[in-house]
Amino acid sequence: MQFDTLPQLGDSVSKICLGTMTWGQQNSEQDAHEQMDYALAQGVNFWDTAEMYPSPPDKDKQGDTERFMGSWFAKTGKRNDVVLASKISRNDFLRGGNTKFDKKTIRAALDSNLQRLQTDHIDIYQLHWPERQTNFFG
């Protein structure tokens, strides 16, 4: 496995990132755990998730991907072996429909991420979709 260093973190991260957006929709919790075991065994230590996963977004399944990851961290104790990235989302079924990225909303989202992930920190936190006047990319 090839690695790069994240300057602000000083962490060595794999050039391949484990994406998780289907866990809870196309993959079961057991499947997710097996994929995390395999990824780490192959040296993939950079993992990405988001509060809105699984995809496509569904208010009844929202957060399942992070919950699966959190149960794996609790079971294995390997949270510190992973560089974890997650994201705040703007889905209108989250936080009572508040889709603004203000301090209060970001804090509420982050607290929920941490609870589902069963961890006290997320290494990289991102805005899943920027606030913009149009729904088009670009």
Predicted features along the sequence, with ranges:
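Short beta-strand segments at enzyme active-site cores
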Residues: 46-50, 83-86, 121-127
